[in-house]
């Protein structure tokens, strides 16, 4: 009799442990926003440059790694158009933007206002505006200013802050959000 009771106890214990393992696994599954980056799939960005009139659709990550030719196209797209200077943009910025679009539930084109800025351009802008930082992340290829048509700036800001992935600036009077890595 004791043997039968122990077998039932062991069977119930195994079921309980298995159920606990399933529950734990479900609890640590990535959230949809995290899954956007953690799932190996292509990452595509569509952008319009409001100063140059250019548009781009770039698959910068193929599910296994970054695509260098596409990163080069994005670097050119994010160039300092005033000085016609190009700098390598931190791919993490593109990842952030892709993830942000996932959080917002949109793949609408991003309206780029400012990407890379040379130090000279940054200094010129600083002379005209108090809102331009002396050691701006734009000069390092680690920042962008943008908006997305049809998405409230306040929602873009909230989503960017929720990622905790870098700096976030909110400029509703100038109609843009700033993110950096």
Outline where the language-model segments fall.
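Catalytic cores and adjacent binding grooves of peptidoglycan-active enzymes
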Residues: 2, 43-48, 131-181
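Active-site acidic/histidine clusters and adjacent loop/turn architecture
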Residues: 63-113
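Solvent-exposed loop/turn segments at secondary-structure junctions
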Residues: 52, 64, 117-121, 151-153, ...
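C-terminal segment of N-terminal export signals and the immediately downstream linker at the start
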Residues: 30-58
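Extracytoplasmic/secreted envelope proteins and their assembly/folding machinery
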Residues: 94-101, 122, 153, 157
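Acidic helix-start/capping segments at beta-turn-to-alpha-helix junctions
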Residues: 109-123
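N-terminal secretory signal peptides and thylakoid transit peptides that target proteins
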Residues: 3-27
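Charged, often glycine-rich, active-site loop that binds/positions anionic groups
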Residues: 120-136
